[in-house]
Amino acid sequence: MAEKFRVGITRDILDSRGEPAFGPAALSILADAPGLEWEYLPAVVRELTPEHAARYDAVYVNMARTPATAVARADCRLRVVARHGVGYDSVDVPAMTRAGIVVTNTPMAMPRPVATIALTFILALAGKLALKDRLTRTGRWDERMDNMGMGLTGRTLGVVGAGRIGKELLRMARVFDLKLIAADPYVNAVELSYIGARKVDLDTLMRESDFVVTIPLFNDETRHLISTAQFALMKPTAFFINVSRGPVVDERALIAALQAGRIAGAALDVFEQEPVDPANPLLAMDNVIVTPHALCWTDECFHNMASTGLKSIVDAASGRRPEFVVNADVLTHPRVLSWLAR
């Protein structure tokens, strides 16, 4: 009898009741697959180990890191690392490719949810939502006249990174009659013009925008893409929003810009250090909105991510190429060809 294809799911995707945060429906994708068995990892882990790679053919990973050391041993049976999300900076992709391990992600599940949270931040900053909530709760009703918001009509939204998520945000923002600009060296001007946006360089975007939203893919090229020089270009009335990855922004430079009043405020769903240090100065600023890298986490978003991610595992178990392969070069690796050719 053939050995079953074994799948491990990291426990950091469970809620406080021990139930999958993406709901039960997506698990049927695994339960209904012939020749496959699955389990949650025995404990919450910050990174996968050689023992995990020796036990499982595929691992569905939320936040745990997948380093090169995890797949360095000769007894590694791991074939697939499936990320619950679009980002894969937590996975040593070159090491996985060398080891003949397919890395997948869930890009199509993310554009609308992440674009929605960026738009949520824009509206909250423009209307001074957090401040007015505090005024109401602390009996400062009479201070309303001193806290006017910013109207959106004719204002400029600048999007740094015009991939799937950036384009979705630009499309959604058109209803507010904003001027739309975007900076992305890998997207052409004609493509952006189809959605009503103008392509500009990063410096121009920082100077012209009333709202700057960063949504680039995080890699070595985009680490600290936004730093002191970029914040110095912004209008003092402009707002900064980051919904990509914390290290895209030089956090010290952002703190300095806010403390000096060089920009009007910020909204962040991500931080350079996560979980964020409770002593981080950003948490004490009244003009900064913060959320715990989870604002786009909705039942719909998590179900769609899990459905896509778990299907990629079932595809691999069945000898099929998963739909969203991050490291396409691995598909010619002899180890991958051995199971794709079955």
Give the ranges of each region predicted by the language model.
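Short glycine-/small-residue-rich Rossmann-like dinucleotide-binding loops
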Residues: 64, 86, 216-218, 244-245
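Rossmann-fold NAD(P) dinucleotide-binding segment
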Residues: 65-78, 221-239
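Short beta->alpha connector loops at strand-helix junctions that form conserved
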Residues: 84-85, 101-112, 184, 203, ...
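Phosphate-binding beta-alpha-beta segment of Rossmann-like dinucleotide-binding domains, i.e.
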Residues: 99, 107-156, 171, 175, ...
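Rossmann-like dinucleotide/phosphate-binding beta-alpha-beta segment
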Residues: 144-236
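Rossmann-like dinucleotide-binding domain for NAD(H)/NADP(H)
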Residues: 237-239, 243-342
